[in-house]
């Protein structure tokens, strides 16, 4: 037997031994350090490398898959929020505002004209999502199937999938390409080959793998009523809007190609269409300074003109080939020192209200490509440690989610209460309803309800209408057909939140109708609650009889 063959035989022997020891530990209710176990068994058997997690998962007998796979799951945080997120990228294309500003944003590293020529706009091509997209030659079907297979091999459930469409301004691409891209995302879940977006959505609705939502990255100038309407047809439920700064002078100096006033108008239109709105912000931009940075985040969370549902924080990075790189090289721009940046991020996180979710705290760009800027690969952890030191708390949605709390703090909720928070934002009345354990500050499920303003452009939402912009019960992904008493999805919290939303809409908003912006794969859930398809929404007429 050649060397490769003997190593394969040793690998099989090692995997069998590891699985046997894991089963013994499970039966004896003992905890095991898997990395240490892999190292010891591989060394004992003379294996020159440690077996991969995928190999161990494949070696688990069918009888033990249900009990061992949750313990073996790689990066459990990937599905801790109850959803398997699949990020996909559209083909490389030029930034749309080049036509009227003459250039891209000063800090933007990617795109077809950049040093990273096979990358999409604002990406280098070396981020994990970019590399998967390049391997698949930006084919949406191959990107989706590849990522789903990867997640399944690592022990994750892919019963509920949320797509994030990345790679620049997707809505600036030609309509036929956009239709092709979205059609293939839905077809990758259903296995059907569709001729149109409508057909793809119809099959996706009945698929075993449910598309519970699509998130699209866009800009204020590509978030007009016609764009909002197209995205509804795709099954999009959340928008990520690149804003970067709330200061008009900074938007102008960094060559954003839009005004902050247009950002506020976009937020208003998007929320009146039912979308969840996530904002991208960049601390440490040129000509801002520490105090102005703190003030803009205070304004972001407190001013009714903004108040986003989610936030992605991308501290400014200096990358070769950008306008900012030239400013930095000639001494006209200097990044914050690492300790100052950590302090700033800690301050920002302490300002986040309990109805906002912080999705990211830094870019995925590999550190060797960064000339100046973030020096820590785990900036969020450093900021959280600083907050603990200063006695500050981060109360954003992600920090308080039950799934995240279980992973990081081994804490489970005990006394669960219905909690309500009301605020005004973007011309409408917002109500954030949640089931929480207030004593331990753990969040189990949430619902975002909005009384639509009179500026709504959709016919389905005109008049006295309330809209549910988000319903989410947290905890590890549970198959739609299963009920696991230790997990919080499918335990009835969702229907209780919907009942309360209907009561508020009927009695306080005095609405005649309640609509839900629903992911394609969750429409059946709302049908069971008495909702009917109403254009792209699921709607229900509210009257006195529905109060029973």
From Swiss-Prot:
All copies of domain Radical SAM core, residue ranges: 78-368
Cofactor(s) for this UniProt protein: [4Fe-4S] cluster
SMART domains: Elp3
Positions annotated to bind acetyl-CoA: 160, 470-473, 493-495, 526
Keyword Zinc: no
Name of the protein described by the UniProt record: Elongator complex protein 3
Protein family membership: Belongs to the ELP3 family.
Pfam families the UniProt entry points to: Acetyltransf_1, ELP3_N, Radical_SAM, Radical_SAM_C
Organism the protein comes from: Caenorhabditis briggsae
EC annotation from Swiss-Prot or TrEMBL: 2.3.1.311
InterPro entries: Acyl_CoA_acyltransferase (IPR016181), ELP3 (IPR039661), ELP3-like (IPR034687), ELP3-like_N (IPR056591), Elp3/MiaA/NifB-like_rSAM (IPR006638), GNAT_dom (IPR000182), Radical_SAM_C (IPR032432), rSAM (IPR007197)
The N-acetyltransferase domain, residue ranges: 392-548
Keyword Iron-sulfur part of the UniProt annotation: yes
Pathway: tRNA modification; 5-methoxycarbonylmethyl-2-thiouridine-tRNA biosynthesis
Subunit field text: Component of the elongator complex.
Cofactor binding remark: Binds 1 [4Fe-4S] cluster. The cluster is coordinated with 3 cysteines and an exchangeable S-adenosyl-L-methionine.
Disulfide bonds: none
A molecular function GO annotation: 4 iron, 4 sulfur cluster binding
One cellular-component annotation, GO: nucleus
GO biological process: embryonic morphogenesis; olfactory learning; oocyte development; regulation of transcription by RNA polymerase II; spermatogenesis; translation; tRNA wobble base 5-methoxycarbonylmethyl-2-thiouridinylation; vulval development
Keywords associated with the record: 4Fe-4S, Acyltransferase, Iron, Iron-sulfur, Metal-binding, RNA-binding, S-adenosyl-L-methionine, Transferase, tRNA processing, tRNA-binding
The reaction(s) this protein catalyses: uridine(34) in tRNA + acetyl-CoA + S-adenosyl-L-methionine + H2O = 5-(carboxymethyl)uridine(34) in tRNA + 5'-deoxyadenosine + L-methionine + CoA + 2 H(+)
CDD domains: Radical_SAM
Positions with a binding annotation for [4Fe-4S] cluster: 95, 105, 108
Function statement: Catalytic tRNA acetyltransferase subunit of the elongator complex, which is required for multiple tRNA modifications, including mcm5U (5-methoxycarbonylmethyl uridine), mcm5s2U (5-methoxycarbonylmethyl-2-thiouridine), and ncm5U (5-carbamoylmethyl uridine). In the elongator complex, acts as a tRNA uridine(34) acetyltransferase by mediating formation of carboxymethyluridine in the wobble base at position 34 in tRNAs.
């Amino acid at each position: 037997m050649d060397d490769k063959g003997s190593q394969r035989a040793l690998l099989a022997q090692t995997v069998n031994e590891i699985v046997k020891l894991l089963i013994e530990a499970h039966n004896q209710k003992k905890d095991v350090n898997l990395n240490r176990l892999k190292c010891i068994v591989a060394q004992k058997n003379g294996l020159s490398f440690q077996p991969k997690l995928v190999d161990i998962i494949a070696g688990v007998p069918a009888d033990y898959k249900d009990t061992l796979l949750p313990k073996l799951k790689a990066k459990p945080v990937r599905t801790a929020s109850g959803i398997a997120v699949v990020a996909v990228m559209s083909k490389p294309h030029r930034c749309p505002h080049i036509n009227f500003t003459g250039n891209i944003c000063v800090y933007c590293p990617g795109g077809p004209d950049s040093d990273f020529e096979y990358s999409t706009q604002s990406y280098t091509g070396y981020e994990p999502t970019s590399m998967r997209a390049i391997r698949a030659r930006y084919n949406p079907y191959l990107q989706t199937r590849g990522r789903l297979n990867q997640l399944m091999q690592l022990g994750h459930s892919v019963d509920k999938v949320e797509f994030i469409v990345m790679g620049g301004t997707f809505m600036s691409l030609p309509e036929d390409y956009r239709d092709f891209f979205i059609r293939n995302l839905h077809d990758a879940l259903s296995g059907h080959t569709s001729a149109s977006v409508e057909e793809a959505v119809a099959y996706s609705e009945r698929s075993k793998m449910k598309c519970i939502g699509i998130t699209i990255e866009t800009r204020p100038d590509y978030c007009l009523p016609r764009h909002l309407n197209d995205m509804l047809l795709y099954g999009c439920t959340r928008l990520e809007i690149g804003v970067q700064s709330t200061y008009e002078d900074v938007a102008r100096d960094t060559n954003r190609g839009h005004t902050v006033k247009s950002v506020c108008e976009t937020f208003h239109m998007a929320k009146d269409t039912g979308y969840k709105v996530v904002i991208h912000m960049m601390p440490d931009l040129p000509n801002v300074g520490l105090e102005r940075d703190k003030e803009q985040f205070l304004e972001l969370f407190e001013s009714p003109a903004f108040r986003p549902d989610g936030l992605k924080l991308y501290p400014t990075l200096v990358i070769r080939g950008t306008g900012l790189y030239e400013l930095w090289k000639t001494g006209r721009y200097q990044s914050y020192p690492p300790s100052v940046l950590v302090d700033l991020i800690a301050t920002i996180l302490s300002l986040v209200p309990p109805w906002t979710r912080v999705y990211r705290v830094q870019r995925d760009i590999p550190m060797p490509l960064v000339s100046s800027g973030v020096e820590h690969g785990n900036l969020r952890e450093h900021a959280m440690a600083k907050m603990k030191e200063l006695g500050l708390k981060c109360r954003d949605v992600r920090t308080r989610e039950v799934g995240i709390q279980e992973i990081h703090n081994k804490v489970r909720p005990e006394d669960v209460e219905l909690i309500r928070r009301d605020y005004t934002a973007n011309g409408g009345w917002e109500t954030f309803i949640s089931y929480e354990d207030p004593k331990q500050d753990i969040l189990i499920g949430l619902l975002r309800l909005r009384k639509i303003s009179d500026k709504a452009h959709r016919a389905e939402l005109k008049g006295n209408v309330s809209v549910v912009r988000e319903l989410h019960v947290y905890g590890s992904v549970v198959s739609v057909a299963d009920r696991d008493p230790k997990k919080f999805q499918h335990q009835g919290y969702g229907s209780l939140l919907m009942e309360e939303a209907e009561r508020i809409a009927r009695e306080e908003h005095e609405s005649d109708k309640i609509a839900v912006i629903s992911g394609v794969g969750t429409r059946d859930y709302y049908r069971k609650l008495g909702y009917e398809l109403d254009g792209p929404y699921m709607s229900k007429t509210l009257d006195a009889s529905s109060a029973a």
